[in-house]
Regions:
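Collagenous Gly-X-Y triple-helix signature in extracellular proteins
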Residues: 1-196, 205
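Residue-level detector of alpha-helical secondary structure
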Residues: 206, 210-213
Length: 215
């Protein structure tokens, strides 16, 4: 099936729809008066959540290796001509599984989906062939001493299930962003894509070629 793209505004893409913008493919998760929440359709890179030891904040996204990587991605987009205003700030709640809030909420223009966000939108999110990080810590240093894995971070496995892993494991990075609903994006034109020469019987195709060359 041929893939023909057409331009539409992001506001006209349905939730769960796949679109292309900034040279990347995304899935639209939700929309409100602020903009459209989107997730990368694919993993952009694989890396540890955190390298080295940090007993105070071992699984805090703000102090992770992932945030500098995402910052570089944002800088590359703007360097290539995309206005910074295209990336609407979004708030990421770093509350852990037990309800501890010591990492707080921080505002970024590009980040990771939280466990709560994944729980809300998982039906819309395409599975990928490698595990990928979420923003949510499993536990934090100030959680109950009876809580295990207080240095772990939640991630999504290839089958779509959630689990927790040590922060220095190497998993996928699948960014979440918020774009304006007025952003022009590209989507597949399903109506046009239905036509393909591969679906035309060979005899009909040869007859058409003959009629055009003899006319």
């Amino acid at each position: 099936m041929s893939k023909i793209l057409k331009s539409v505004t992001l506001g006209n893409v349905k939730n769960g729809g796949i679109f292309k913008a900034l040279g990347k493919e995304f899935v639209k998760l939700d929309a409100d008066e602020h903009g459209c929440l989107v997730l990368a359709k694919d993993i952009w890179t694989k890396m540890p959540f955190r390298e080295g030891d940090d007993p105070e904040c071992p699984n805090d996204l703000r102090r992770s290796e992932i945030m500098p990587y995402l910052g570089n991605c944002l800088a590359e987009f703007t360097k290539n001509g995309t206005p910074l205003s295209t990336f609407i700030p979004l708030r990421i709640d770093l509350q852990d599984t037990t309800g501890q809030n010591e990492y707080g909420i921080f505002e970024v223009r590009i980040g990771l989906l939280t466990l709560r966000g994944y729980g809300k939108y998982w039906r819309l999110i395409p599975k990928v062939d490698a595990p990928w990080w979420l923003a949510t810590p499993y536990g934090t240093p100030n959680c109950s001493p009876y809580t295990c894995n207080d240095s772990d971070v939640w991630y999504v496995d290839t089958d779509g299930s959630g689990s927790d892993g040590w922060y220095n494991f190497s998993y996928g990075v699948r960014p979440v962003l918020c774009f304006s609903s007025a952003l022009l994006v590209s989507v597949e034109d399903e109506r046009e894509a239905r036509f393909s020469l591969a679906n035309v019987p060979l005899d009909d195709l040869l007859a058409e070629i003959k009629s055009r060359t003899e006319g």
